UniProtKB/Swiss-Prot annotation:
This is Octanoyltransferase. Residues 34-214 form the BPL/LPL catalytic domain. It comes from Ehrlichia canis (strain Jake). It catalyses: octanoyl-[ACP] + L-lysyl-[protein] = N(6)-octanoyl-L-lysyl-[protein] + holo-[ACP] + H(+). Catalyzes the transfer of endogenously produced octanoic acid from octanoyl-acyl-carrier-protein onto the lipoyl domains of lipoate-dependent enzymes. Lipoyl-ACP can also act as a substrate although octanoyl-ACP is likely to be the physiological substrate. One of its GO terms (biological process) is protein modification process. The lineage of its organism: Bacteria, Pseudomonadati, Pseudomonadota, Alphaproteobacteria, Rickettsiales.
């Protein structure tokens, strides 16, 4: 399936988390029924925490700091908020003949790694610690988190990339259940980029990486 058939939707203001989940669930049904195109949805949320299907109470360190939403994506606790670019990806793995979840996650990783490389950020995918990582001043830190769900072989939820995120909000959780490593952002790495600049490269790299994902 050509990447030209994938719709791109970019939001200019923060989207309520529950509203976003409801939209994705309806979109999954429409894609499965052949009524709508696949979609990559770029947005940001107000400051909040989400608890994936693997979340444990011990990983929520400050329950009163921000709103907390339980969600059906994979993974544990993560933070979403201003300065973080979220890409919710709704693709039909069945029509792409790619009913392979591991391959899909790896392809997501390749997409983000190639995008970051454009901005001279060297990053890598760690299959044991899901997400995209960088080494900064000799310390490994996560710059992009993954959390996906697949229903009817349609993917949804997706990837969050820290651009100029307030990293102090991560102190209220154990991000993705990983105590040993921290998080970082474009800003902390000394890379200044706008959403507009990032989105252009993100779409370009998506078309390159996912062109063979069918």
């Amino acid at each position: 399936m050509s990447c030209d058939l994938v719709e791109w939707k970019i939001e200019s203001s923060p989207i309520d988390y529950q509203e976003a989940v409801y939209f994705m669930q309806r979109k999954v049904d429409s894609i499965s029924d052949g009524l709508q195109k696949e979609l990559v949805w770029l947005l940001e949320h107000p400051a909040l925490y989400t608890a994936g299907t693997g979340a444990t109470v011990e990983d929520l360190l400050a329950s009163n700091l921000l709103p907390v939403y339980s969600t059906n994506r994979g993974g544990k606790y993560t933070y979403h908020g201003p300065g973080q670019r979220i890409a919710y990806v709704m693709l039909n793995l069945k029509t792409r003949n790619k009913c392979n979840v591991r391959l899909y996650v790896k392809t997501l990783g390749d997409w983000i790694i190639n995008t970051l490389s454009h901005f001279s950020i060297k990053s890598y995918f760690n299959p044991d610690l899901i997400g995209v990582w960088v080494t900064h001043n000799g310390i490994e830190k996560k710059i992009a988190a993954f959390g996906i769900r697949i229903r009817k072989w349609i993917t949804y939820h997706g990837v969050s990339v820290n651009i100029y995120t307030d990293l102090s909000h991560y102190l209220g959780i154990v991000p993705c259940g990983i105590k040993e490593y921290g998080v970082t952002s474009f800003k902390q790495l000394g890379v200044n980029v706008s959403y507009e600049e990032f989105d252009i490269v993100l779409e370009k790299k998506f078309n390159e990486i996912f062109s063979s994902f069918n």
